[in-house]
Design a protein with these regions (language model features):
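Conserved, mostly hydrophobic/aromatic
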Residues: 1, 68, 111, 151, ...
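Active-site-proximal beta-alpha core segment in soluble small-molecule metabolic enzymes
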Residues: 1-148
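Glycine-rich nucleotide phosphate-binding loop and flanking beta-alpha elements
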Residues: 26, 53, 74, 157, ...
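Anionic group-transfer/hydrolysis microenvironments
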Residues: 50, 71-73, 114, 152, ...
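Glycine-rich beta-strand-to-loop/alpha-helix junction loops that act as flexible
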Residues: 115-116, 149-159, 194-199
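Short glycine/threonine-rich loop-to-helix capping motif typified by GTGT followed
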Residues: 120-127, 158-170, 201-213
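A compositional/structural signature marking long, glycine- and acidic/polar-rich segments
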Residues: 133-141, 148-154, 162-176, 191
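Charged (often Lys/Glu-rich) extended helix/loop segments that serve as interaction or gating elements
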Residues: 173-175, 179-183, 187-302
């Protein structure tokens, strides 16, 4: 609906490139088919499972492009071994040979590679990238029309003032590894697409709060109460222990004290503290007569 609406407003033509990710309901598949049947030829639905191609075949009456999402292996610390999304590494080549190679209309154009932990300079990440490249090289040799690799998972965003991540190094290293692997395999390098959701929009948002009271529960713990709830306005802080840049907005020259931050709800999890995160929280000393405001930054992703 958004694609159609923007087209009708003249924002782009029917040559716009659209990648359709995720598990697709019948309604989602029907709307993808409608776009392709109405002349949008650069729509690429990324197959999450075998059923999706069958449904698209039933409803599209012309040639169309598709991609396949690789079901990557998760980090050892995860509660499951393989991503719930996509098709397994070992199943992609047989699936292509049996269902796509002789398909009258579908053309495989893209492999989608997504790592939940994001792009990190770790053995786990490089190992998963190499497995993806092996699939790409094998596919390219039997399916020349495959020409694109969509890298998901994305770059991290700055979550603390001492954040240190060498973006340029990682970009250069990823491109270098892809180029080197393709040269060794004797296949053409793919067009590289990226999906960096948090990195793209993370810095677009911030949350501002007022400290409305301080509670001393014992000799060591001081609770600064905000005029809102972390559970409702910043749910990532308690749900997945997300850390954000947090700074006082005023009284920077005052004396500081170590505190815990609590939300207004009666839920015991409605807090943001130094035990849960990497840095202790220090704020200007609470005063009933001097208002204190704080801000959480780079919260625009979710």
């Amino acid at each position: 609906d958004i694609i159609k609406s923007l087209y009708e407003k003249g924002k782009y033509g029917k040559d716009v490139e659209v990648i359709c990710n995720g598990f697709k309901t019948d309604d989602y598949l029907a709307k993808i088919s409608d776009l392709i049947n109405s002349g949008f030829q650069n729509i690429i639905p990324i197959l999450d499972n075998y059923r999706e191609l069958d449904k698209l075949t039933e409803s599209i009456d012309s040639t169309f492009n598709i991609g396949i999402r690789i079901a990557s292996e998760e980090e050892p610390k995860f509660e499951f071994y393989t991503s719930r999304l996509g098709i397994g590494y070992k199943d992609i080549i047989p699936y292509y040979s049996q269902k796509i190679a002789e398909h009258p209309n579908a053309r495989l154009k893209m492999l989608h590679f997504f790592i939940n932990t994001g792009i990190k300079d770790t053995a786990y990440y490089w190992n998963e990238l190499y497995k993806c490249l092996r699939v790409y090289a094998r596919l390219k040799k039997i399916a020349p029309e495959v020409d694109s690799l969509n890298i998901g998972g994305g770059f991290p965003i700055k979550t603390s003032l001492n954040f240190d991540y060498d973006y340029q190094y990682m970009v250069n290293e990823i491109v270098s590894q892809i180029k080197k692997f393709c040269e060794e395999e004797g296949v053409e390098e793919p067009n590289i697409y990226t999906e960096f959701g948090s990195f793209t929009v993370g810095e677009s948002g911030g949350h501002l709060y007022k400290i409305i009271s301080q509670k001393r529960q014992n000799d060591r713990e001081k609770w600064n109460m905000i005029d809102s709830s972390f559970m409702t306005t910043l749910p990532d802080t308690w749900a997945i222990s997300r850390h954000f840049i947090m700074l006082p907005l005023n009284r920077w020259e005052d004396t500081y004290e170590r505190v815990f931050l609590g939300g207004l709800t009666c839920d015991s999890d409605d807090y943001y503290n130094s035990e849960q995160h990497t840095n202790a929280i220090y704020l200007p000393v609470f005063s009933d007569t001097k208002p204190l405001y704080i801000g959480f930054f780079h919260t625009g992703a979710y």
